[in-house]
A protein has these predicted regions:
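Hydrophobic, well-ordered beta-alpha structural blocks that scaffold small-molecule cofactor pockets
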Residues: 2-22, 28-178
Length: 178
């Protein structure tokens, strides 16, 4: 069965599952599971796991498609370099799609971060801390997409802010997010 997602996205997803404790990367004796779950419990856990994996892969596929369209649209508008705002699974996908689309990801702005790197991209606490120039801002904030959109729009103008469709950020007739 073909999932339609790149191996890099699968690897990123597996790492995320391991870090969340959903998947263990070690050999475990087969009988050990009997101590944790009844057969009915194991069946329910399996069903929930399948549901979670299905919805997660759907998110990854939709996010990848949205990011590729968004970067293509940005490229047509002359945007060659962008800053992401909001550290999330969506930001991971945007970094991977940015490489695929030859769009430079200059930095990731995340007010809660204390620096470092995210998939090789510098993490900064504010737009003022971004050291390189950039053409546009991409909202990748899953917790407060509207807040990040409003902040970026006020600072750089609506025409320089890109938002993946799956975030559901829409504009009313006056140009405000609704």
């Amino acid at each position: 069965m073909e999932l339609g997602i790149a191996l890099g996205l699968v690897n990123a997803y597996l790492k995320r599952c391991v870090s969340k404790g959903l998947v263990k990367v070690q050999n475990v004796p087969a009988r050990r599971y009997a101590y944790y779950l009844t057969p009915q419990g194991f069946a329910e856990k399996s069903r929930l796991t399948v549901d979670y994996l299905t919805s997660s892969f759907s998110f990854f596929r939709q996010a990848k498609a949205d990011c590729l369209v968004m970067f293509k649209t940005g490229s047509l508008a002359g945007f060659k370099s962008v800053v992401l705002v909001g550290r999330s699974d969506l930001a991971e996908i945007a970094v991977i799609c940015g490489m695929e689309s030859q769009t430079e990801i200059v930095a990731l702005v995340d007010a809660k971060s204390t620096g470092g790197h995210f998939l090789g991209v510098p993490i900064v606490a504010s737009f003022d801390a971004v050291e390189k120039s950039f053409d546009a801002v991409v909202v990748t904030d899953l917790e407060d997409a509207y807040g990040s959109w409003d902040l970026a729009k006020a600072r750089f103008g609506e025409e320089r802010v890109l938002v993946p469709r799956l975030l559901g950020v829409t504009k009313d007739l006056q140009g405000r997010a609704s």
